[in-house]
Amino acid sequence: AYLQLADKTKARMAFEQAAASNADPKIKEQAAYNYALCIHETSYSAFGESVTVFEKFLNEFPNSPYAEKVSNYLVEVYMNTRSYDAALKSIDRISHPSKAILEAKQKILFQLGTQSFANTQFEQAIGCFSQSVTLGQYNLQTKADALYWLGESYYRLNRMREAARNFNEYLSLTRQRDTEMFALAYYNLGYIAFHQKDYSTAENRFRNFVQLEKGENPTALADAYNRIGDCNLNVRRFDEAKQY
């Protein structure tokens, strides 16, 4: 009745009292859910009291028919506020997080990894991306993207073996093959092989890049052609090298 009258403050107080009472467990559960909704709808903080109340509900009523809705509300708050560190702490306080919440955790760790990468904190980025990959069963494309950026992070640290492994895993897993990132994975693998003096593999990877590049990165495209020429020079295929 209170909710229908839109008197959210009175409704919140009534539901809070019912949730804290010694009433029938089903009544307590319903009241706790309604209380959580009231808090969510009247909260002045984007990431505040509503998150705490939703966490409490999931821990007290993990098998509730409302658990999925509450989980979805939490995911919405986690992703929309972009308070990623606070979101991780919130998820860690939930005893039995849903698949939706664990998928959100996977994506949050990926976002934290990209932030660290942008700040040239490559070791920290590797930690975040690795944790995101561990949760890969929840969203395969996020896992693939994390593998790519793991490769980039290792590459920046000159750890070429790990970089190559992650780029190759990314190429095997991703379904988004019509992207600049897909092309760049081959470009990076070309350079890894080139530095290892594996000129045959390097040439193949640079050729893969050239075939996939759509003109979005003319600098890398010109460089790849030069490296194909260098690969031919290094194996003394001079006629082929002249073409580049």
Language model segments and positions:
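Acidic, polar-rich low-complexity tracts and alpha-helical solenoid repeat scaffolds
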Residues: 1-244
